[in-house]
Amino acid sequence: MAHPLDFRGNISSEFSYFGRSSVGTDNFNFNSSVAAEVEVTHDLNDNIRLIAHPFARWDEHDDERSRFVLRELLLSANFSNWEINAGVGTVFWGVTESRQLVDLINQTDAVEATDNEDKLGQLMLNVKWFSDYGEFEAFLLPRFEERTFKGPNGRPFLGITVDRDLTTFESAQGDQHLDVALRWTHSVDAWDIGLHYFDGTLRDPLLQVTQTDTGPVLAPRYLLVQQAGWDAQGLYGDLAVKTELIVQGGDEVDLHVETVSGIEYTWVGALSPMQEKEMLPDDWCTPDTRNPFKKLICNDRIDLGLVLEYLWDERGESSNQPFQNDLLAGVRLSFNDTATTDALLGLVQDLDGGATTLSLEASTRLFESFRLSVESTKFFNTGGDASLQAFENESYIKADLSYFF
């Protein structure tokens, strides 16, 4: 039996504006970029599927961001209660909004965005077993992918260039160290629960200041860790309770605990711009209207969600990441329209140093094949937080228009 290719993808144009000049070598305020990605799936037979997901980007200023990467090239086989995946794949774990502590399989593609949501493909052998007692997974990860970083002309700029040529590893095997991960997930009543164990090279590098002939740079060092953790989400009507926790340690990493926990409450239909539609002309609230303003006015049900999360790291100021004692408060709007319009406004407050990060993400579909996304981040009071001081001049607004095919 013939199995046709399933071919889909998108082409996007991105435009960014930075309100202040950077301390980098190229003090531009505007940046443009073009990207394309394709997802191809082909069923070789009823049990075996081939998946390919290439991605390419050209950036106006940052050479490190102009590249071609393979996010997935995976052979997936399903037999009874078993699934085997071999090749380059992408795996996501986590339930919280602000930070996913348990999401450790894939490396962050940091040249794409600052929210750590974009990932590089990971070479893997993944075996899953589905049972009445949950889903059991095992991973063998034979090659490590180094984190990408923006170049000296890239923005947002760290304040000092990361030189990947100076990368070191705790493991004598370098990027060839064999990492191992185990995971169990199960649903119990209102809760979805996940447990994991990881032994291998930590994806988050330690960035060490190093002097070179051209001045100071940051040299990445990747450490070996053993990590155990859990993630859980409970749904009680309109209330979602979320939590992630890890215990992590190694020869060069002090044994410590990190956690993110919080809630999200959704008021369904909390905002209804125009309940009395008889006040409007007869042709306004037709189901097929394409006018975005009319869609907003005529919407019967706009859901309002409130998000609250607490982030904690036992190491405090000695941690190599900024979320040691922080609070996230956010508002999510879901317009429930045919354009799937949504928006998320979030504020992260450092409860020790006083730094504040305000972010906005919003998107809507235009016509049948286009989607417009807007993202903005503003940094306040960064002087008291060493990990955020570099972003003092890096507040930005970004618009992305994508065509899907």
What are these regions (language model features)?
Residues 41-156, 189, 307, 377, ...:
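Outer membrane beta-barrel
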Residues 5, 46-50, 81-84, 133-136, ...:
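Repeated loop/turn-to-beta-strand initiation elements of outer-membrane beta-barrel proteins
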Residues 127, 263, 270, 391-405:
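Outer-membrane beta-barrel "beta-signal"
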Residues 236-349:
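Detector for outer-membrane/organellar transmembrane beta-barrel domains
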Residues 11-21, 49-59, 71, 108, ...:
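Transmembrane beta-strand segments that form the barrel wall of outer-membrane beta-barrel proteins
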Residues 5, 40-42, 76-79, 88, ...:
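Residue-level signature of outer-membrane beta-barrel architecture
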Residues 9-11, 52, 84-86, 127, ...:
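Membrane-embedded beta-strand positions of outer-membrane beta-barrel proteins
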Residues 26-34, 66-71, 80, 119-123, ...:
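Residues that define the transmembrane beta-barrel architecture of outer-membrane proteins
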